[in-house]
Curated annotation (Swiss-Prot):
This is 7-cyano-7-deazaguanine synthase. Transmembrane segments: none annotated. The gene is queC. It comes from Escherichia coli O139:H28 (strain E24377A / ETEC). Pathway: Purine metabolism; 7-cyano-7-deazaguanine biosynthesis. The keyword Metal-binding applies. Catalyzes the ATP-dependent conversion of 7-carboxy-7-deazaguanine (CDG) to 7-cyano-7-deazaguanine (preQ(0)). One of its GO terms (biological process) is queuosine biosynthetic process.
Length: 231
């Protein structure tokens, strides 16, 4: 039996990963992390979606220690979430240091326990957000370290790594879940479901990708299929 664990926030990317994983694996587990995030409404959204889509199990892990250690606008109400700035340089203040290191490591421990062969995460380098822990190089390095440390070949899969946000919408549509992803996920840094606040970087990236896809579905769908190997 093929099993996978999806790092699941209830946002566009991880929900698309879950939708695909449910088609590719016999048993899919979801793991969501409560780190005291500003947009913690995503936890309830993740619960609803994991149940609705048919995950075998869904665990919400308390990692609020991260909130104490990592200073970010996503962990501190006193730090405002910035509006989207297309020319902004450097690491944005929405970056939570160590978040993906912790999430992927804990997800791998869970995968070990449930005998899953893969941990799936929705990080992406094509629409690079300025987050160093979304890079392919980082994921591969951590995967190698975790496999060595557990003496077990647990594979980190990043199905969205080389597709852009428009193509991510196409992937959801390929599996017949575009409307669900658009209306029932929570990507917004300000914790607003669906189309979100419309101002933060997460909402801007999501909206631009959707508009691009809806404007030229055949071309974007073809590009997505070529990059992912889907037919």
């Amino acid at each position: 039996m093929k099993r996978a664990v999806v790092v699941f926030s209830g946002g566009q990317d991880s929900t698309t990963c879950l939708v695909q994983a449910l088609q590719q694996y016999d048993e899919v587990h979801c793991v969501t992390f409560d780190y005291g995030q500003r947009h913690r409404a995503e936890i309830d959204v993740a619960r609803e979606l994991a149940l609705k889509l048919g995950a075998r199990a869904h665990k919400v892990l308390d990692v609020t220690l991260l909130n104490e250690l990592a200073v970010s606008s996503l962990t501190r109400d006193s730090i405002p979430v910035p509006d989207y700035e297309p020319e902004a340089d450097g690491i944005p203040n929405t970056f939570v240091p160590g978040r993906n290191i912790l999430f992927l490591t804990l997800a791998a421990i869970y995968a070990y326990q449930v005998k899953a062969e893969a941990v799936i995460t929705g990080v992406c380098e094509t629409d690079f957000s300025g987050y160093p822990d979304c890079r392919d190089e980082f994921v591969k390095a951590l995967n190698h370290a975790v496999s060595l440390g557990m003496a077990k070949d647990i594979r980190f899969e990043t199905p969205l790594m080389w597709i852009d946000k428009a193509e991510t919408w196409a992937l959801a549509d390929y599996y017949g879940k575009l409307d669900l992803v658009r209306n029932e996920t929570l990507t917004c840094y300000n914790g607003i479901k669906g189309d979100g606040c419309g101002h933060c970087a997460a909402c801007n990236l999501r909206a631009n990708g959707l508009n691009h896809y809806l404007a030229d579905k055949p071309t974007v769908m073809a590009a997505m299929k070529q990059k992912t190997g889907l037919r």
